[in-house]
A protein has these predicted regions:
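NAD(P)H dinucleotide-binding glycine-rich loop of Rossmann-like/cofactor-binding domains
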Residues: 77, 93-181
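Short glycine-centered segments of the SAM/dcSAM-binding site in methyltransferase folds
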Residues: 83, 177, 262-263, 287
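Adenosine-nucleotide cofactor-binding segment
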Residues: 174-183, 193-253
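N-terminal Rossmann-fold NAD(P) dinucleotide-binding loop
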Residues: 187-188
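Rossmann-fold dehydrogenase core element
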Residues: 263-265, 276-316
């Protein structure tokens, strides 16, 4: 089917209007009209080929909210008119043990990314949510619950599930002591979600200027990581620290903050980490772990949780033709805390 959107054609060029062919729907597919598309920092990395695996032309976008406009003959979960959401995956083998556990993000045979990935059947490169339509296997679409604001829901499909998944994996709830390093797109969601789960939440920041923002998002306090006395007083005071910082940084100041059996989980940095001292880990039975996104079942759980608890990302709405300006602002950390494209603006941008 004919579709259109915005694409990166080269690492050095801005995104431009792009017309392309979506694959024909299969019997178990739903076709979505995209209403809102979140702008993830990984979209910028992929457009600029920072990770050296981008295939051009690239249509980014893996935080997608839309309306079903067509269903395949075997589809049972959705009907035309339903509001659905799609995140970072559009397929997996659905046969391995990980898929059987509802952890398609850890598929033994590799999941299919929403964009810049080979289709499991044809090998064609997938194209993402900066576009008019999406064709997706029904198992990889989540239902938008009643009461969840469609215009603000899109970032839940990446920033939301990326932080929700480790909070659930490490059983965060009332009485849990959670630290969050970084207060950007991921960090602000980690704070909101952990607070909604009943945890005591502390934002760890190099700047005291983040205090007002941290408290407004639901944190109980701010810990200044450059304050040696405050950091010493906070030793052994966290069960879980969620590290959302997207660049290489030193973990040594944070490991002593974990209590016995505590975990620092990395969700923001993709690539080499700084070396860190293993002594605090050995002496305190502490752990450093990583966590990607969650599976489809957990993503649906997140959407239902956010509807029930009224947890939504803080977003700035933009038009499609403002995407290059948004990318520039993201590089300057000039957004609180996530851009969302109103895809109704797409046609006027062509």
């Amino acid at each position: 089917m004919k579709s259109y959107g915005f694409a990166a054609t080269d690492a050095r060029e801005p995104l431009v209007p792009f017309t392309f062919e979506r694959r024909a729907p299969r019997p178990n597919d739903v076709v979505m009209e995209i209403l809102y598309s979140g702008v993830c920092h990984s979209d910028l990395h992929m457009a600029r080929n920072d990770w050296h695996w981008t295939v051009y032309p690239l249509v980014p976008g893996h935080e997608i909210v839309g309306r079903v406009i067509e269903i395949g003959s075997d589809v049972t979960r959705y009907k035309v008119g339903d509001h659905v959401a799609v995140g970072c995956m559009v397929d997996s083998c659905l046969e391995c043990d990980q898929c059987g556990r509802g952890e398609e993000q850890l598929c033994r045979n590799g999941n299919t990314g929403t964009y810049n990935a080979p289709d499991r059947i044809t090998g064609d490169i997938t194209r993402g949510g900066y576009s008019k339509h999406l064709v997706v296997r029904e198992e990889f679409a989540c239902r938008i619950p009643d009461g969840l604001d469609l215009s603000r829901a899109a970032p839940l499909l990446c920033a939301g599930i990326t932080t929700y998944s480790p909070l659930r994996t490490w059983n965060v709830g009332p009485g849990s002591r959670v630290g969050v390093i970084g207060l950007g797109g991921l960090g602000h969601m980690a704070v909101k979600l952990a607070a909604a789960m009943g945890a005591e939440v502390t934002v760890l920041s190099r700047s005291s200027g983040k205090a007002e923002d941290a408290l407004a998002l639901g944190a109980d306090k701010l810990l200044i990581s450059t304050d040696a006395e405050a950091m010493k007083a906070a030793q052994s005071s966290f069960d879980l620290i969620v590290d959302t910082v997207p660049v290489k940084h030193d973990l040594d100041p944070y490991l002593p903050l974990l209590d016995v059996d505590g975990t620092l989980v990395i969700v923001g940095q993709v690539g080499p980490m700084s070396a860190f001292n293993s002594v605090p880990m050995l002496l305190g039975r502490r752990r450093v772990a990583g966590s990607p996104i969650g599976g489809i079942r957990q993503t649906q759980e997140l959407l239902d949780f956010c509807a029930r608890k009224n947890v939504l990302p803080d977003v700035e709405m933009i038009r499609m033709d403002q995407i290059n300006e948004a990318f520039d602002r993201m590089e300057r950390s000039d957004v609180r805390y996530r851009f969302v494209i109103d895809m109704a603006s797409l046609q006027a941008s062509q």
